Structure formats: C-alpha cells, structure tokens
A protein has these predicted regions:
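Short acidic-hydrophobic, aromatic-tinged amphipathic segments that line or gate anion-handling sites
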Residues: 93, 276-279
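Conserved glycine-bearing catalytic or ligand-binding loops at nucleotide- and phosphate-handling centers
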Residues: 278-296
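Thiamine diphosphate
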Residues: 4-137, 142-186, 193, 199-203, ...
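Short beta-alpha junctions and helix-cap segments that line functional grooves
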Residues: 104, 230, 288-289, 375
C-alpha cells in the first residue's frame, strides 16, 4: 500500500538478524544478501565524506558521482526486495553508529516517496548476559521452569512424538518459551518453526491434518487470537484434528496487559465442533495431552494452561477428558463451585473457608469447557445454587455458555465470576485475581451473597 501510494514515509528497519528467536523466512534471506553490501556501503560513505570536503565543488561532485554509482550498482545488482515494492532502499548502515544513522535519516527525509533505511544492530549489545545468551539474546528473563506446566507439556510431547511418528509440533517463532526447544534437535523434521506467523501456523497445521498427520500447535493464548479466522474456517469448518496447546492462558500478570490470555474461551466456545480442555494440575495436563492424541474426537482440540506453577491441591482424575470431576461430593451441598483449570485450587480454598462458617459447598473441576459434561448439568439441576469461576473474560466464557445451556426454565441461581469487560493492567497474578474476585476470599464472599 505504501509503495502504491507514493507517500513521503520513512521506514526504519532495525535488523538484528532475529525476532523473538532466530529469523525464519525468505524475507530474512533477502536481508542477508542486503547485509552483504555492508563493506561497500562503508567505503561509499567514506568516499562521499572525502569528496564533500573539496572546496567549492564538493557537493556537486558528490551528487554527480552518486548518480553514476547508482546507475552502475543497478546494472550489476538486482533491485532489492523493497524496491520491487516501490520503496526506495538505503543501506545497510551500522545502527550503532549514531552519526551514520543520522545522515541516513536526513538523506531519507529529503527523498520523495516511501524510503526504507536499513540499519544493522546487535540484539543486547553492550550487556554481556544478553550478548552471551545463545537462545534469545535475553529477549526476556523468563525460562521454562522445572515442574512448570510448560515443562510438563514438553516432556509429555517428547514421549508422544517418540511413540507416534505422525505427530508434528509447530511453533510461531517461540520454540523456547513454548517448551519445544528441548525436543527440537531430536525431531528436526517434525518440530517446525514457521516464524512470527500464527495464521500460517494454523493453516499449515490444518494441511498436515488433511494429509493424515497429527499436528500440535504450541502457542501463547494471547497470540492465537491473531489466527481466529484460520482456526474457524480452516481447521474447525473442515473438522480437522489439530491440537492447540495454549500456554499462558488466563491471567499472566507481570507479562503485561497484552499478554493476559483471557480471551481464548470467549472466542472459541462459539465455534462448532471445537473441544476446549482446561487441566487443573500438571498431571492432568499430561493425561489430557496423551488422551487427546489418541482420542477419536473430530475437529480441533484446545488445551489451555496458565503461566503459574501447577497446584497439588486437586486430586488426579483419570476419567474421560470430556468429563468433569467432582472434587468433594456432598449430599447436602448448598452451592456448587465450578472452577475452570488453574482456578480450581482457589475454589477448593474457598470451599474450606466456607466450611468454617457453616456453609457446605461442593467443588467441581470443570475440565471440559466445551462440550459441557451432561453429568455436571444434572448435578446443577439438583443443587440449584451455582457459582462458576474462570480466569477469562466473562462475556462469552464458560459461565455464560453454561447459563445459556441451562436456559430460563431451570430455576437455577447462577453467578458467573471472571474478568469483567476490561483490560487488566500490569500486576502480579494474585493481585489481579483479587481485583476481579476470583481468589479464594472473593469466591467465598460471592457464595455468601448468593445464598442470602
């Protein structure tokens, strides 16, 4: 669009040969070729500065020689990728040489039409720990922690891929953070990094599924929102079994407002034929992933888990992955607490708090966000008072879908807890859960209000 418009726009390409991870694409290869001109550009700049200093005629000489050099260069070199798009290309320049960058920007500003200034930089330059980090150049300080959901996913997927050569793992430029890096070397042809291209990752995975393979897409919850169209119209519409493993689902806290994975349930529960699973423990994640690869489920399967460490509070349940789990069945329950995924431990804590106040609550681990377990519906119709708790946007989420499924004739009092109509600010997970009322105290308080 910019090239077609001819607008006077200056684009700065900060080229450090990386994105989140090493760059993967033919565009990246094109930049490699452009970087090869670096020595020529340096000598060119020195010559220009020398000629510019010639008294009286310096600037005219530079202008004339510049035109000649351009003609010679275009004769011997093909046009750059950007020039084919109608964008004037300048560079590459040393991005750490401020004077060189300033000269380049001034030159670009004086040109008509869109101009791209290509600067070469080193990611993490000047900071030893970043420069010496071979994986991400300290893009962030996070890492896959021992015993985390991500580590459990990585170990389980390695086991699955060892047993089943039809399983492929796909990442969009995040092999380290999603847990695929430890298994990438062992399965070089089956762990595929498509670059920062989530839409392509989903369509590519769908193509693999159509070809008889079993693709597992490892992606942060917040980044799958970029590929909603592909999930719906490529994978789901064609009933292709693609397993989407959503790390950082729910409230991530200190990752910032853009990284809270609170929209996935609301976005995908409305999609026909999709299955959404939310493990409440690390052991349950491993179980669900194995069962998902073996099951006869038709269509996409989403498994979502949080950044926070797995809880040991939730007893393991090896029932079918479509079934919900009653954590503490009670015949005289006054209220049902229905927790989704990582929120189940909060519900268990709330249940204990309520018990000390003489209120009997029955806690359920939902497990299957979609489809909803018919056994759970039956129990709801018996108890009548229900509080659902999820770490996602309320609108369109599990609780609202449950209420819609129950309808207006069920005479059930249902209260839905989750993230209201807002973007959450940067803060720790505990503070944000308290703010939206899905910590143990908030849940207990809501139950007492419901029973009044």
């Amino acid at each position: 669009n910019i090239g077609h418009s001819g607008a006077d726009v200056v684009i700065v390409l900060n080229d450090n040969e990386r994105s989140y991870a090493p760059t993967v694409s033919m565009l990246g290869n094109s930049l490699v070729k452009l970087r090869a001109n670096r020595t020529f550009r340096k000598n060119e700049e020195k010559l220009a500065r020398f000629m510019e200093e010639i008294p009286l005629i310096g600037k005219q000489v530079v202008k004339g020689v510049g035109s000649a050099k351009t003609a010679v260069r275009e004769y011997f070199e093909p046009t750059s990728f950007f020039e084919d798009l109608g964008i004037t290309y300048l560079g590459p320049f040393d991005g750490h040489d401020l004077k060189a960058v300033e000269r380049a920007l001034k030159t670009a500003k004086g040109l008509k039409g869109p101009t791209l200034v290509h600067v070469l930089t080193q990611k993490g330059k000047g900071y030893g720990p970043a420069v010496n980090d071979p994986i991400k150049n300290m893009h962030d300080i996070g890492a896959v922690k021992e015993g985390s959901f991500t580590q459990i996913f990585s170990d389980t997927l390695k086991e699955i891929m060892t047993e089943n050569e039809n399983v492929y793992a796909i990442t969009a430029a995040m092999p380290d953070s999603t847990g695929l890096l430890p298994i990438q070397d062992e399965f070089k042809d089956r762990v595929i990094d498509v670059g920062i291209a989530e839409q392509h990752a989903v369509t590519f995975a769908t193509g693999l599924a159509m070809g008889g393979k079993l693709p597992v897409v490892a992606v942060y919850s917040t980044f799958l929102t970029r590929a909603v169209d592909q999930v719906v119209y490529d994978a789901a519409l064609h009933k292709q079994k693609v397993i989407f493993c959503l790390d950082r689902a729910g409230i991530t806290g200190t990752d910032g407002p853009s990284h809270n994975g609170v929209f996935d349930m609301a976005l995908f529960t409305s999609v026909p034929g999709i299955t959404i699973l939310a493990p409440a423990s690390g052991k349950e994640l491993a179980f669900m992933l194995k069962e998902a690869t073996k099951s006869e489920i038709e269509g996409p399967i989403i498994i979502r888990w949080p950044k926070t460490a797995p809880s040991q509070l939730v007893p393991f349940f090896d029932g079918d992955i479509s079934q919900s789990q009653c954590v503490n069945e009670s015949k005289d329950s006054q209220v049902l607490l229905l927790g989704v995924g990582s929120i189940v431990p909060n519900c268990i804590d709330a249940m204990e708090k309520l018990r000390t106040e003489g209120i009997t609550a029955e806690c359920w681990n939902v497990r299957s966000v979609k489809p909803i377990d018919p056994r759970l519906i039956e129990r709801i119709l018996e108890v009548k008072n229900v509080v659902t708790v999820e770490d996602g946007i309320i609108s369109g989420g599990f609780g609202q879908n449950l209420a819609a499924q129950l309808g207006t004739k069920s005479n059930v009092m249902i209260k839905v807890l989750g993230v209201a109509d807002q973007f959450l600010e940067h803060a720790d997970v505990d503070s944000l859960q308290q703010k939206v009322g899905i910590n143990a105290d908030g849940i207990a308080s809501t139950v007492k209000e419901t029973l009044k």
